[in-house]
Amino acid sequence: MAVAGPAPGAGARPRLDLQFLQRFLQILKVLFPSWSSQNALMFLTLLCLTLLEQFVIYQVGLIPSQYYGVLGNKDLEGFKTLTFLAVMLIVLNSTLKSFDQFTCNLLYVSWRKDLTEHLHRLYFRGRAYYTLNVLRDDIDNPDQRISQDVERFCRQLSSMASKLIISPFTLVYYTYQCFQSTGWLGPVSIFGYFILGTVVNKTLMGPIVMKLVHQEKLEGDFRFKHMQIRVNAEPAAFYRAGHVEHMRTDRRLQRLLQTQRELMSKELWLYIGINTFDYLGSILSYVVIAIPIFSGVYGDLSPAELSTLVSKNAFVCIYLISCFTQLIDLSTTLSDVAGYTHRIGQLRETLLDMSLKSQDCEILGESEWGLDTPPGWPAAEPADTAFLLERVSISAPSSDKPLIKDLSLKISEGQSLLITGNTGTGKTSLLRVLGGLWTSTRGSVQMLTDFGPHGVLFLPQKPFFTDGTLREQVIYPLKEVYPDSGSADDERILRFLELAGLSNLVARTEGLDQQVDWNWYDVLSPGEMQRLSFARLFYLQPKYAVLDEATSALTEEVESELYRIGQQLGMTFISVGHRQSLEKFHSLVLKLCGGGRWELMRIKVE
């Protein structure tokens, strides 16, 4: 079986080129789906804010020339009026700049939400998450691209947004204006101003620190959720759990985004404080100079000399230099954005390509699990045969070495099959083909029943437990607890936990629906994890149970008891195992001998 082809554009070296532009434009279509979308309206709001902000900045820039007159003429009343006007303009400008930053942050959150959920839809469609993490090696760290790269891309892009959209206006205008225009008191005042600003900002920062720590925790939880899918992609794929994991991962995303919105609301007041003190500092020099001027210290200077003293920091030139400096500073940010664009764009192109191909070859869709039908309800069309294999040959991905050759097999209800053989002979590989995770290199594999409670259920070699309550572990991967079942469902779960030898687990978790803050893999032993998997199997009650060494950590006595209960519940087993004690629960044994050879024998009933 061949590994899936390389990612679109995988051979190209990421650069600031046409491919970058194409990928960037495709991402923009996700961020701005229409002119009337929320993101487009916020971006238009940002443009209006920056234009208004630049108008106010220009008015502030005219203040120095007016100061020249009042200071040169020693007009105290005029100075007071002008200073009041300047302070009002500075406060207005600081507020506008704060809302500018606030809007950029809201854009970041909204962009991240839309882009991440877009990638989630593609990633959890079918078994794309399994293919990317297990069968392909051309897309590195898809979880990092979705969680970290998207976050950094949106943050960097939002930090550039206001500067980029206003730069053409400011550069042209201030270039023209620049072309046309061609003691102890100071230190004490400056230090006092600095100390005051530090105290105010320290007060405003207090509520932010705790919220920021919580945000970083949720960021780690969100990354861990994707890591959990990556590490357990195969068990999740056997469970056909893409839909439920999609919901759970989006749920963690929503918690993170809600915390970020709360954090940014608190940061708004900090922005106002910081920016107000930043811009008030621009007139501090005038205030410092005004005191000695009106006290007669500079009485011997002419008006021209006073003007020279006051105009040391000419507004237009300084601001023009600042505009160019900002653009130069953005070059580093732009290179980062280009890198993230290529990584996200390549992942998106690969997922879209896989999605198009899977429409033709996918055996079953998300409805395959019957996720909205509780176990115990009648199936629509019961089937007597689960799998029909005709001259099937199997090889591992990226390998031509045959594991199984020309296998013909019919697995029917009541005819349990035991698969044995040494390590590396293809036992689990055969289950992967039955589960649709791999394709056979030759022959025909037909699955004549459904996945889920009324058809086939796989218990992978490595038990899989998602985040959630004890009830959610037992009913997994069903999405919801069915309200119509009520206490009857509770009784079934408790009974099956007891049959699996886990009645004490209810006390440890303080109930079926108590949220736990631990990782199930950290608190359960290997034997307990296998017992809990059987409790899940009993609850779902499939007609066919495919077990990949599902009792390897249990004693033969416990193994026999669990198999006996499964038989009483009407299950037909397809088991991979090594113990001879398993034979009494099966009708046939398929022995894989290596090199593609196999033997199919009927087990004699003694």
Curated annotation (Swiss-Prot):
Domain ABC transporter: start-end pairs: 389-603
Protein name in the entry: Lysosomal cobalamin transporter ABCD4
GO terms, biological process: cellular response to leukemia inhibitory factor; cobalamin metabolic process; cobalamin transport; fatty acid beta-oxidation; long-chain fatty acid import into peroxisome; peroxisome organization; transmembrane transport; very long-chain fatty acid catabolic process
The entry's keywords: ATP-binding, Disease variant, Endoplasmic reticulum, Lysosome, Membrane, Nucleotide-binding, Translocase, Transmembrane, Transmembrane helix, Transport
Pfam families, sorted: ABC_membrane_2 (PF06472), ABC_tran (PF00005)
Family in the record: Belongs to the ABC transporter superfamily. ABCD family. Peroxisomal fatty acyl CoA transporter (TC 3.A.1.203) subfamily.
Annotated effect of mutating residue 426 to A: Decreases interaction with LMBD1. Decreases colocalization with LMBD1. Decreases cobalamin transport activity
